[in-house]
Amino acid sequence: HRVDRRQRQMCIRDRYNGLVQLDDGLNIQPSIAKSWTISEDGLTYTFNLRDDVFFHDDMAFPNKKGRKVVAEDFVYSFERVWKGSINSPGGWIFKGRVAEENPFQAIDNQTFMLRLVKSFRPMLGILTMQYCSVVPNEAVEKYGADFRKNPVGTGPFKFKRWLENQSLFLTKNKNYFEKENGQTLPYLDGVRVSFVGDRKTAYLELIAGKTDFMSGLESSFVNELLSSDGELLSKQSEKLTFLKSPFLNSEYLGIRFNGEANNPLVNKKIRQALNYGFDREKMLRTMRNKVGKPANSGFTPIGLPSFSYKKAKGYNFNPDKARQLLSEAGFSNGKGLPTIELLSTKDYEDLCTFIARQWEDIGVKVQIELEESATLREKMKNGQASFFRGSWIADYPDAESFLTVFYGKNPAPPNYTQFKNVAFDAIYEEALNENDDTKRYALYNQMDKILIEEAPVVFLFYDETAWFVKKGISGLSKNAINLLSLKKVKK
């Protein structure tokens, strides 16, 4: 079974396990932890571990046989991330959240305890992330900096071989602990991950039958796969299956708030005019073949339980309203309004050009400047981008993961717009301490209403996954975090 390079991070999940995992509905399910309890104050999490989970067989162990996972392994694995002993981008998950002294404790071999500084309802969701996977200290100490080239986990597939920038080979873990209908997983004997340089190449290899799976689309080939209504073309339907579902990714144009005083976007009416001034439905139909939904209910995307079209009503296409707002801002028909510079990357040039042309009709002129992805991210981080194309993908399945982007005390990232709003911040802090989901979701809706009113971004669309799977393959299921798990796949 082969996949393209976009799935490399996804395949990490099939080499490791954590305490808990997500199902396709983004509900928390047991993994190595078979059960857990949370104290009434929300500060202490106690996990009861399975006693039939073993690390992959490896040279790091006596007789090359993987040993049983115990609670102390989670203490070790979490402390590696928390203390920064590894160059992990996941250090933030525990920072400021766990107790300063002994936050991770092994009560006995099968009982692991985690202690927080203050209650944080999304914590279980965070524990599903790959950073919270368990690893054996023996392998980390044996391989040192080369552990990434010799990974040892507990997942359904184990590392076999890596040809850098070419291929990653995984093989079946015959000692894996999960079963389906009494049969031990996984079903596949192995996986080959091909490191393809770009999506166009991935598409060509998929069509040629060299790969079995591809995720994502680009304008260079989207019309070869999908109709303008988002349906798989008949010429492809004999060879491929198309799977589409909500993806927790909000696409937007960000506006830096503490920018130059002469920047017209400091005027809220102009920001609102931009949001009214283009047709999201047409944009998605003509530019993305209906992969995605118009972002007309705030920043929190479809796919989260707190999402509501009714409770947070955003912007629709209303050019007359846009012109009225421009007039109220002192720029009737755009007269006197300077050209606005929009920073983007090459892969979003077509989409930004579409929007800019529609804005011309209401009197707003936009000049698109293209940057390399790394350069644009650096400018966003350093406050050098006044108007920029951005996206935000959920780290964990809770709206807090999106709303934190606008919390005034956060740096860039995640707060690239440097948005500060006293009311928003107060509600955000209240939501962090609210353990009742219904009440917390209501607070999330209030924050989205503030974002709609203040318009620190131009809301573009809520993304959707686009998976193309070779006929004859079963067991792949759709989920809103775009996770690829191969443990139940059959070919």
Go through each PLM region and give its residues.
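Aromatic- and charge-enriched surface segment that lines or borders ligand/interaction sites
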Residues: 34-87, 113, 202-205, 264-265
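A structural "hinge/loop" feature
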Residues: 5-9, 13, 32, 59-63, ...
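Surface-exposed binding/hinge segments that line
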Residues: 37, 72-73, 80-137, 161-163
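N-terminal lobe/hinge region of extracytoplasmic solute-binding protein
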Residues: 5-9, 13-40, 79, 86, ...
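Detector for C-terminal structural segments
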Residues: 121, 163-167, 243, 251, ...
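Structural transition elements
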Residues: 157, 262, 268, 293-329, ...
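Aromatic-rich, solvent-exposed beta-strand/loop patch
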Residues: 56, 115-133, 148-201, 225-250, ...
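A bilobed periplasmic-binding-protein/Venus flytrap-type ligand-binding module shared by bacterial periplasmic
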Residues: 171-177, 245-273, 277, 286
